[in-house]
Amino acid sequence: MLDPIAIQLGPLAIRWYALCIVTGLILAVYLTMKEAPRKKIIPDDILDFILVAFPLAILGARLYYVIFRFDYYSQNLGEIFAIWNGGLAIYGGLITGALVLYIFADRKLINTWDFLDIAAPSVMIAQSLGRWGNFFNQEAYGATVDNLDYLPGFIRDQMYIEGSYRQPTFLYESLWNLLGFALILIFRRKWKSLRRGHITAFYLIWYGFGRMVIEGMRTDSLMFFGLRVSQWLSVVLIGLGIMIVIYQNRKKAPYYITEEEN
């Protein structure tokens, strides 16, 4: 088992979980700022947004996690704020971040679709890296399996939990998000019929579908009417993504690649 603490500085413990999240954030900010001028968005506005959105998204992710495990946390109130032990729900962070983005874009007079489109691939790569925090914490894993011989030894050993090998669902989602990120980079450079909002829609559909499938492998999620709560939210994301494509096509939204860039 790998030590979840990366660096120990006296009483201060810096955990791999935090490093994975922060690394993903830094890379996401860099990529978003790099693409921002293409959509006539000031890069400094991206930094201003992150300073507001990131802490609120962390709070939203934790609140979502605590709410759906309230039976436990109502008896362990002191652990509600112990985010260093894990327990950040991505959907809670996404919902909070989207709300903050909408308000921020409105106040800065930035087109919300443009902001979402340049942020979507960055969010995907941040999620891909962030999932490795679950790996170090030995959480968000799947059902038991006979062996994991197809995986590198360090992953196989870390996924040996409570006397059994577990499906490395963190890895599946990380790779799925990485592939989605790569596809978006290709689409937004090569697909000339890509309209404003289409990248956001692709993110919602791609992530929603992958999460719905992978979530079915997990054993630690809350069930609701035969599906896990996260799977229901995945269905919502997929439906929302499809609606965005239809809506933007019908209103003939501007193309992502402008005539000046062709």
Swiss-Prot record:
What residue stretch is flagged as signal peptide? none
Look up the record and name the pathway of this protein. Protein modification; lipoprotein biosynthesis (diacylglyceryl transfer)
**Its topology with respect to the membrane?**
Multi-pass membrane protein
Q: Which UniProt keyword terms apply here?
A: Cell membrane, Membrane, Transferase, Transmembrane, Transmembrane helix
InterPro entries documented for this protein: Lgt (IPR001640)
- Per the UniProt entry, the Enzyme Commission number(s) are 2.5.1.145
**Which is one Gene Ontology cellular component term of this protein?**
plasma membrane
Instruction: Mark the transmembrane ranges.
Output: 9-29, 41-61, 80-100, 109-129, 167-187, 197-217, 226-246
- Where is it chiefly localized? membrane
Which cellular compartments is it found in? Answer: Cell membrane
Pfam families for the chain: LGT
**Keyword Calcium tagged:** no
A GO biological-process term: lipoprotein biosynthetic process
Source domain of life = Bacteria
Does the record carry Transmembrane helix as a key word? Answer: yes
- Molecular function as annotated in GO: phosphatidylglycerol-prolipoprotein diacylglyceryl transferase activity
Please tell me which top-level EC class this enzyme sits in.
transferase
Chain residues that bind a 1,2-diacyl-sn-glycero-3-phospho-(1'-sn-glycerol):
131
| Function text | Catalyzes the transfer of the diacylglyceryl group from phosphatidylglycerol to the sulfhydryl group of the N-terminal cysteine of a prolipoprotein, the first step in the formation of mature lipoproteins.
What the record says about family reads: Belongs to the Lgt family.
- Name the HAMAP family for this protein: Lgt
Query: What is the name of the protein in this document?
Result: Phosphatidylglycerol--prolipoprotein diacylglyceryl transferase
Q: Which organism is it from?
A: Streptococcus pneumoniae serotype 2 (strain D39 / NCTC 7466)
The encoding gene: lgt
